[in-house]
Curated annotation (Swiss-Prot):
GO terms for biological process: ribosome biogenesis. It comes from Teredinibacter turnerae (strain ATCC 39867 / T7901). CDD domains: EngA1 (cd01894), EngA2 (cd01895). Associates with the 50S ribosomal subunit. This is GTPase Der. Residues 351-435 form the KH-like domain. HAMAP family: GTPase_Der (MF_00195). GTPase that plays an essential role in the late steps of ribosome biogenesis. It holds the Pfam family MMR_HSR1. Keywords: GTP-binding, Nucleotide-binding, Repeat, Ribosome biogenesis. Residues 3-166, 177-350 form the EngA-type G domain. InterPro entries: G_ENGA, GTP-bd, GTPase_Der, KH_dom-like, KH_dom-like_a/b, P-loop_NTPase, Small_GTP-bd. GTP 1 binds at residues 9-16, 56-60, 118-121.
Length: 464
């Protein structure tokens, strides 16, 4: 599973700065979900090919009241759900009582915890970090998050132990189609899971009991092997009523990153709400293949159905590549049709293509619509090759590729989507510029060229 790293510490110790550096963004993703703190931030990150989720848990000052105490409590929940903890302290402030309190709590969790001394720049390194050894958390890793100093060394240490596990997960994904069922609370995720697993043709292996964590369920349907990742964390049992679902954004993000295909479940009776779009954004950002299911469809009046369809066209136009299903998980209407879309999306997301084929598509696209001029010179796109799958990545080589405008990239995405019949999956375009061996070198003119240049210059002067 993709590991989750929680950034923990007092307010203003640099958690957001480190978060932005790790996720390479200034605009932190704010998860504004019901029942969750408003300022907890989540983002996907990658370091040396290893993917992970970063959580900025918000500051814990120790004297919270009212809403602050709720936010602190939810920060503790995020810490408890994470796999690795980066505990940030401020070298300029030195060791504080709140730092000691937080350290005391972290020691009780028995999780991999790395003590990170931030803002070490401009200070005597050894003197600045010395007080923090008192916290009893082992080695002190010094960084200057604002400038990026020490961050790569820190992350290499933090992620060293998960390398083998990540490779094993990737190998396992090749053998079995993993699909994650995600959605906000009470849209019918658990009912859909039970319906999908309850079909007569489904053979479930080692059915787990009730748990609040995401559940990985291996099963077989029509001689095809699947792993279903259930983020709702509740199971059907005889004579037991459905329990209240505990929604966890961390578990949802982990499930998205670990899946090949994501099924986003929405409540048709409520239409599309902002929380649905937040989750959809995470799925798109991860690059996973996508299927959208509108649940509770059979209970709607015809007028409301028309309204919902209009809203879908208006608000989900940016994911027009995803199949849309109108289902009733409770009665089973339309549920079986999900598999066809899942298989099609998975096939498109994992297909392999030759360099010659991708280059031919590029050449046709450039012939039909040339890249724009930049400072009087035409951007040249020479050849393309595959750079990865799930999502499909097309790497295009050429000159001045850093100047390719967004609208032209969108054009190429549409061309490749149409040519490769990429149904149900996003496609990503990456550019590479070849190094110019003559960059920075002046041409040395021959004697004959110098004579010609002087003659031309005389002609220009006479005209003036």
């Amino acid at each position: 599973m993709i590991p989750t790293i929680a950034l923990v510490g007092r307010p203003n110790v640099g958690k957001s700065t480190l978060f932005n550096r790790l996720t390479k963004t200034r605009d932190a993703i704010v998860a504004n979900f019901a029942g969750l703190t408003r300022d907890r931030k989540y983002g996907d990150a990658e370091f040396e090919g290893k993917r992970f989720i970063v959580v900025d848990t918000g500051g814990i000052s120790g004297d919270e009241e009212g809403i602050d105490s709720v936010m602190a409590e939810q920060s503790l929940q995020a810490i408890a759900e994470s796999d690795i903890i980066l505990f940030l302290v401020d070298c300029r402030d030195g060791l504080t009582h709140v730092d000691s309190q937080i350290a005391q709590h972290l020691r009780t969790l028995h999780k991999p915890t790395f003590l990170v001394a931030n803002k070490v720049d401009g200070q005597n390194h050894d003197l600045a970090i010395a007080p923090f050894f008192e916290l009893g958390l082992g080695e002190v890793h010094s960084v200057a998050a604002a400038h990026g100093r020490g961050v790569n060394t820190l992350m290499a240490t933090v992620l060293a132990d998960i390398a083998v596990e990540s490779e094993a997960d990737e190998a396992d994904a090749e053998r079995r189609l993993k699909m994650a069922i995600i959605g906000r609370p009470n849209v019918g995720k658990s009912t859909l899971v039970n319906r999908m697993l309850g079909e007569e043709r489904v053979v479930v292996f080692d059915m787990p009991g009730t748990t609040r964590d995401s559940i990985y369920i291996d099963y077989e349907r029509d001689e095809k092997h699947y792993t279903l990742i259930d983020t709702a964390g509740v199971r059907r049992r005889k004579n037991v009523k459905l329990t209240v679902e505990k929604f966890s954004i961390i578990k949802t993000l982990q499930a998205i990153n670990d899946a090949n295909v994501v099924i986003l479940v929405m409540d048709a009776s409520e239409g599309i709400v902002d929380q649905d779009l937040h989750l959809l954004g995470h799925a798109i950002e991860s690059g996973r293949a996508l299927v959208v299911a509108l649940n509770k469809w059979d209970g709607l009046e015809d007028d409301h159905k028309s309204y919902v369809k209009t809203e879908l066209q208006r608000r989900l136009s940016f994911v027009d590549y995803a199949d849309l299903h109108f289902i009733s998980a409770l009665h089973g209407t339309g549920v079986g049709n999900l598999y066809k879309s899942v298989e099609k999306a998975y096939q498109a997301a994992t297909e392999k293509y030759s360099t010659s084929f991708l280059t031919r598509i590029l050449e046709d696209a450039v012939t039909a619509h040339q890249p724009p001029l930049v400072r009087g010179r035409r951007i040249k796109l020479r050849y393309a090759h595959a750079g990865g799958h799930n999502p499909p990545i097309i790497v295009i080589h050429g000159t001045q590729t850093s100047e390719v405008p967004n609208h032209y990239t969108r054009y190429l995405e549409k061309v490749y989507r149409r040519a490769l019949e990429l149904h149900g999956t996003p496609v990503r375009i990456e550019y590479r510029s070849g190094d110019n061996p003559f960059a920075g070198r002046k041409n040395k003119l021959t004697e004959r060229q110098l004579t010609k240049k002087r003659r031309l210059m005389k002609h220009v002067k006479k005209k003036k």
